[in-house]
Structure formats: C-alpha cells, structure tokens
Amino acid sequence: MSQGTIVKVSGPLVIAEGMRDANMFDVVRVSEHRLIGEIIEMHGDRASIQVYEETAGLGPGEPVVSTGAPLSVELGPGLIENIFDGIQRPLVKMREMVGSNITRGIDVTALDRSKKWDFQPTVKKGDKVTAGDVIGKVQETSIVEHRIMVPYGVQGTIEEIKSGSFTVEETVAKVRTENNELVDICMMQKWPVRIGRPYREKLPPNAPLVTGQRVIDTLFPLAKGGVAAVPGPFGSGKTVVQHQLAKWADADIVVYIGCGERGNEMTDVLKEFPELKDPKTGESLMKRTVLIANTSDMPVAAREASIYTGMTIAEYFRDMGYSVALMADSTSRWAEALREMSGRLEEMPGEEGYPAYLGSRLAQFYERAGRVVCLGSDGREGALTAIGAVSPPGGDLSEPVTQATLRIIKVFWGLDSSLAYRRHFPAINWLQSYSLYLDIIGKWISENISRDWETLRSDTMRILQEEAELEEIVRLVGVDALSPSDRLTLEAAKSIREDYLHQNAFHEVDTYTSLNKQYRMLKLILGFYYSGKKALEAGVSIKELFELPVREKIGRAKYTPEDQVNSHFNEIEKELNEQIEALIAKEVQ
C-alpha cells in the first residue's frame, strides 16, 4: 500500500506526492474522509487522481492511500432489480444509512453480504471444469436464473461442491487445479471495469433485437449483439426512445445507465418499470433490469466510471449465455466529463475542447458489445447489444461526439426536432437514419415472418423518398397540380407516416407491436397503394379513392390487440378489395 500527501486540489482532480509505488488506474482513498478516487496519470512520484465524490474542503497535506487494486465491480446474485450509482454503490442501502441526500465517504458493498441465496449445483465431485463453466444455479428473480461460473484463470477438478443456502462470500465449491492448489469458489466474482471480460470467439450478428417500435424494426433494425446510436437535439425524445427499448426489447437482461441526465428521468424508470409487464413472461420488467443512476448533479468523474460499470455488469450476464441490452443515456455527458478532466490535467485539447483520445475511448466502450461464444466447455452463446444516446448541442450532428460515434456504430436513429414539434413520435427521421444490418435481418425475417417483407420495406422507403421530392413541388404549385398517381403516392406516404411510423408510447396497445402485426399493418397500408394504382389505371377518380370508408379502419388498425390481429386484418383486407373492385366495376359500366 502506497501512501502520499495531497499537494493540489482542482475540482474533482487531486494531485498527490509520494505515490511512487502506486500504479495507473489504482483505486485510492483520499483524505481522512476516505473518498474514493482513481489514478489517471503518473509523473515520477506524483499521481493525478480523479475523485468520485465531492472534494470541497480538501487541502494540501492530507493523506492519500493507494489500495493497490483497480476499480472493480462485484458480480453475483443481487444485481437484478437493484439500482447503483456510477461506482456500484447500492442507492437503496445508502438511503437506509444516510437518508435521501448522499453524503461523501460512505463505504458500502455492492452486493448484500447477509442475504442467503439458494444454490443448486449442476456439476458433481470429480468433474473436470474450466474457466466459464457453469457449476450451479441460483433463482435470482422469478424470470432470471443466475448461473454461477468458474472464475477466469481457474481450471481443474471439482474437489467439493455444496448445495443449500449461502451468502455471496461463502464457499460453494473447491477446485483442485493442475498445480495441485485448492481454489475456493464463492458466488461472487470481482472484475476490473476497464478490462473487457474474455470470451472464446466473436460471432457475426444473425437475428434482430425486436423492440416493438415499428420505425425501428421495419426500417432501421438492430441485430442482437449490434451497436446503435440515438442522436438528437433537446426535446426530440431520446430518453423516451431509450425507455421504450429498455421496456420492450426482447433481451433477457436490460442494463440501463442514466449517465449525467436528469434525476427525474431515473425516477420515471423506477416508477414505471415495476408496474409494466414483460410481453414474453407476464412478469414485472424490473425482474430483468439493472439500473445505474449517475445523474447530472453527481460528481463529474463518476460519469466515466458509470459507463464502464454498466458494461462490465452487462458482459457478466452475457457470459451466462443471455441476450443483454445495454442503454447508455447519454454518452455526450460522459464525453463532457472526459473533456472536463482533460482540461484540468492541462492536456492538449482536440476539436471543440474534447480530448484527442475521445474517439478511441468511445470505440473501447462500443467494441465490448457483440455476439460471442462464451468461455466454458458447453459452447453457449451470449449477445450484448449497446444503444447509446448522443445529445449534440443544438442538434448539430457535425460535432465531435456524434462524428466519433458514427465511425463506430452500425445503426443510426437520427431524431429530428421538426418531427418532434409536429408531435410525431418516435421522431426518427426516415431520410437521415440508416441500418447496416438490413441484409442479415431481412434474411431472418423472410425465413421467419414472410418472404415479401423486404419488398414491402423497400417500397415503403421509396414512397417516403418520393414524398420528400414531391413536397417541394406542392409548396410551389399546390397539390392540385400533381398527377393522380403522384397524389396517390403522397396519400400513401401520409398513411405510412401517421398510421404506421407514428407510435404512442403511452397507449397500452400501441406501445408495442409484434413483428407479425407490423407485417400485417404494412401489407394493409401498401395494399391500399397497390390497389389504388390499379383503380386509377381503370379510370377511377382520385377523390372517390380517398373517400373509401375502409380508409378509417386502416388508420385505426394499429390499436388492434395482438390476439385479434389475424382475424381483424383479414376482415379489413377483404373490405378493401371489395370496395376497390366496386369502384372499378362502376367505372367499367
């Protein structure tokens, strides 16, 4: 343990002398208050420390003690349904200790040391095990089975394994290694947050992460193990999009990081999630969620840690063979924390004052996502999908954080303030956004939902692009100057926008749409467009076409409950065909 003394305090940055034996990224305890900090720069025996708690009142001469270990998180039963701060201190436990206002210098363990968990072994004495092998299971919540794994670097034969109720620190198994050492295994592991957890092999994504949000699943889908960014100006709905994805994405585990955003937004999550039911299991959404709250009024340095803490917890569940979705809201606040610390370290600034290493830090974060073959002899697969919100000032997508993010991610959902002001939510601009997973996911949907999905999707995008071109003409000469065919295109685009892409996050049916219902809705809206073209060719007037009674039913189709989709949509399709045929027959006479 290395001990030094403070020589300078500058906001969250503390400089200490006499730290020659300390190492980069060691956790230190600063002053008599024992504040948690991390060494981020070394010059001889001088260490620059970013402190994760309030530094007011600190002064030169106070002691700094290095623990000799990097910033690590505790991984084991008790993570699910919990809410932590950026350095994995449980906020519920802290509230019990000091009340609602967090005071500094609190030392509390992340996992409850007194709670007993029912451990059921899945291996027996004499079995050979290697790092990553599942040796037992704990039913953590009614829907999450926590798999206890052999820690990294341990390999050998099971010498002893127990069954029953244990705390996370009690030994549940003993492994005799090849060097004849006896290693105790408990239900808890520790892992340094800045180092990605190892896996055997990285695989390309092969299936969609179904979110239930029509504009995402249909036009700009995200794959399990993929990376996406949601940039947008203030008030365009980034947080609601993130909440919707956290609620309805078909992942087994959701890790939600509130990094430098408003405290009220985390309150919304805490209030809504326990009341909402998971469409797959019918259980509360909190039973599969881990929350990390690092709101804008908490110390800046802890924002950087919160992103890594969340990613490490997500990787741990991925290693069990689960599909995990990680939401980071917002990576811009994290980048601002990097900029502040870089400025205090007097480093050479890059573009707009951000440090020159901004791009590499963002890449380190996003590259930890992916679909992998986990460590262990059973060859199980896990997937970690990362979705980061970006808050560019004034909605300027050319600023450094957005540009650095765009170089890394494969799905871009660009939020548009003009759509938000028109009350069109989710305000994802269909002309700016893109997804590079279309080929993989199109193939999966063609095999599992319908073969004409890709045709419907490409026709939808074509109609929306044609609408953007026609809008310019309409502004100049008015809609009446257009040909009937162009007017039909405009009407179809309006129907796609208002009846399909627009989705009410607060309506109990419309908030989530299954892939089958999305396919039926799109087929119905485009069915009107295709039939309308035939009717126009047969001489039907555009006015008669627009006044068809079935059009109101098409507009209300999104409110059809999931269990009535096939019967209700078959009826509407039948009505549409009958009414179009009646118009054509009338013209022929």
Swiss-Prot record:
Keywords, comma-separated and alphabetical: ATP synthesis, ATP-binding, Hydrogen ion transport, Ion transport, Nucleotide-binding, Translocase, Transport
EC class: translocase
Binding annotation for ATP: 232-239
One Pfam family of this chain: ATP-synt_VA_C
SUPFAM superfamilies: C-terminal domain of alpha and beta subunits of F1 ATP synthase, N-terminal domain of alpha and beta subunits of F1 ATP synthase, P-loop containing nucleoside triphosphate hydrolases
GO MF annotations in UniProt: ATP binding; proton-transporting ATP synthase activity, rotational mechanism; proton-transporting ATPase activity, rotational mechanism
EC identifiers of the protein: 7.1.2.2
Entry-linked CDD domains: ATP-synt_V_A-type_alpha_C (cd18111), ATP-synt_V_A-type_alpha_N (cd18119), V_A-ATPase_A (cd01134)
InterPro entries associated with the record: ATP-synt_VA_C, ATP-synth_a_Xtn, ATP_synth_asu-like_sf, ATPase_a/bsu_AS, ATPase_F1/V1/A1_a/bsu_N, ATPase_F1/V1/A1_a/bsu_N_sf, ATPase_F1/V1/A1_a/bsu_nucl-bd, ATPase_F1/V1_b/a_C
Any one GO biological process: proton motive force-driven plasma membrane ATP synthesis
Gene3D superfamilies the record matches: 2.40.30.20, 2.40.50.100, Bovine Mitochondrial F1-atpase, Atp Synthase Beta Chain, Chain D, domain 3, P-loop containing nucleotide triphosphate hydrolases
Catalysed reactions, as listed in the record: ATP + H2O + 4 H(+)(in) = ADP + phosphate + 5 H(+)(out)
Example of a GO cellular component annotation carried by this entry: proton-transporting ATP synthase complex
Assigned protein family: Belongs to the ATPase alpha/beta chains family.
NCBIfam families per UniProt: PRK04192.1
Role of this protein: Produces ATP from ADP in the presence of a proton gradient across the membrane. The V-type alpha chain is a catalytic subunit.
Protein name (Swiss-Prot/TrEMBL): V-type ATP synthase alpha chain
Organism whose genome encodes this protein: Acetivibrio thermocellus (strain ATCC 27405 / DSM 1237 / JCM 9322 / NBRC 103400 / NCIMB 10682 / NRRL B-4536 / VPI 7372)
